[in-house]
Amino acid sequence: MTVRVRIAPSPTGNLHIGTARTAVFNWLYARHHQGTFILRVEDTDEERSQPEYTENILEGLRWLGMEWDEGPYFQSERLDLYREAIQKLLDQGLAYRCYCTPEELDEMRTAQKERNEAPRYDNRHRNLTAEQEAAFQAEGRQPVIRFKIEDDQTITWKDLVRGPMHWQGRDLGGDMVVARATASGEVGQPLYNLAVVVDDMDLNISHVIRGEDHIANTAKQILLYQAFGGTVPEFAHTPLILNKEGRKLSKRDGVTSISDFQKMGFTAPALANYMTLLGWSPPDATQEIFSLSDAAAQFDFERVNKAGAKFDWDKLDWISSQYLHGLPLAELADALMPYWQAAKYDFDPVADRPWLDQVTALIQPSLVRLKDVVEMTKFLFTRELTWSEDAQKQLSQESVAVALQGVIDPLAAAAESEFSAEIAKSFINSTVKANKLKKGLVMRSLRAALTGDMKGPDLMESWLLLHQRGEDLKRLQQALEIASA
């Protein structure tokens, strides 16, 4: 079998993490079987679909490294195809016009609720006479098109993730609306289940891979495949992504779109790596870092979990850190540059590039997200240092002024070319010995004076970087004023 899969997002919002994870699984399966990965944009919702969302979705997929082999196909450009299919159902007596008003449907559901029955359409307009239809039309009623679903129909399929699935027609909510109403009485806007089946048949989709929240839709769609005489594809219903409370991840949980993750400073390979693990386990359970290509070579549905996949920020951060720590220095510096520029830090990206590479090397072992670099390196770029409360407490301790003065004097006298880490250490050792100070006091005081905080990257490397900017002596002198106050 030639594998043809599709990702079919709706442009009613930015690319969601759930849709992106579904895209990852489709892409992995296609690549594993040397198949075709197709992009279809389901933009039939005219009110909610927006061009900017379409662009966001396409950009997000490209950014993640999931280029499609065919498409994008747009459902809004295929409406005639759907209407032809609906007319075929009408002509064959498999669908009909339903003239129920919203008020009548509400009354029906209310009565069902009072009887403790599940809400469903009672198929009351399935067998209208021509006279009844004419009477409804004379009232100005606008009909929807409903596809007939018999209560005694049995729908079965072997799900690639969940195994044998069984549904009864009576559990599908009655005859299904496949097209909206129109004032003219013509076939209106085709709805999701109809359009999906027509597209999947037309595009020869072999496998439909999507979230478990579509299982009920699958039962309905199989009936449509059978009605059209089409080949029913294989189905794989993947686990939902859950929040920490075990509920489906939603916008209420905050960050959910791929562009949000980009803004937070996650790289595409790290995020794609993490999404691969949201519901799938590699054969080697200890392997957690791999490229999409590596994952594709190992991917199969036997290792896709049935249970929901909880979104774990700590795990994502750890994976992100592994990628950042392993990036070549120049590549990481290039990735950090936009964050420094957005923060309006004072530097020349060309003239200061050697210094920026050193800054990158300093913070790389501690970097978790690209965006973290803004706060981590602020003390290196700023010309007006602000001392934290902890740093000021350190500077106010006894003997700190003596310690700082013992470093300032030789530093001020040293020639630019003479300064190095070894020389800096000699200044520290000399003031410790000459003033009978504890080395820890001197080191803590220098950190407070030079960085404005009591924690941060390696002190000596930070000092050298500040010296190159001509900032170290100035800061030590300012800190001495605080210590002497």
From Swiss-Prot:
Record GO cellular component, one term: cytosol
Binding positions for ATP per the UniProt entry: K251
Family in the record: Belongs to the class-I aminoacyl-tRNA synthetase family. Glutamate--tRNA ligase type 1 subfamily.
Motif ('HIGH' region): 9-19
Name of the protein described by the UniProt record: Glutamate--tRNA ligase
Keyword Nucleus among UniProt keywords: no
GO MF: ATP binding; glutamate-tRNA ligase activity; tRNA binding; zinc ion binding
SUPFAM superfamilies (UniProt xref): An anticodon-binding domain of class I aminoacyl-tRNA synthetases, Nucleotidylyl transferase
Entry-linked PROSITE patterns: AA_TRNA_LIGASE_I
Catalytic reactions on record: tRNA(Glu) + L-glutamate + ATP = L-glutamyl-tRNA(Glu) + AMP + diphosphate
EC number: 6.1.1.17
Gene: gltX
Protein task: Catalyzes the attachment of glutamate to tRNA(Glu) in a two-step reaction: glutamate is first activated by ATP to form Glu-AMP and then transferred to the acceptor end of tRNA(Glu).
Subunit structure: Monomer.
Residues spanned by motif 'KMSKS' region: 248-252
Keyword Nucleotide-binding (UniProt): yes
UniProt-listed InterPro entries: aa-tRNA-synth_I_cd-bd (IPR045462), aa-tRNA-synth_I_codon-bd_sub2 (IPR020751), aa-tRNA-synth_I_CS (IPR001412), aa_tRNA-synth_I_cd-bd_sf (IPR008925), Glu-tRNA-ligase_bac/mito (IPR004527), Glu-tRNA-synth_I_codon-bd_sub1 (IPR020752), Glu/Gln-tRNA-synth (IPR000924), Glu/Gln-tRNA-synth_Ib_cat-dom (IPR020058)
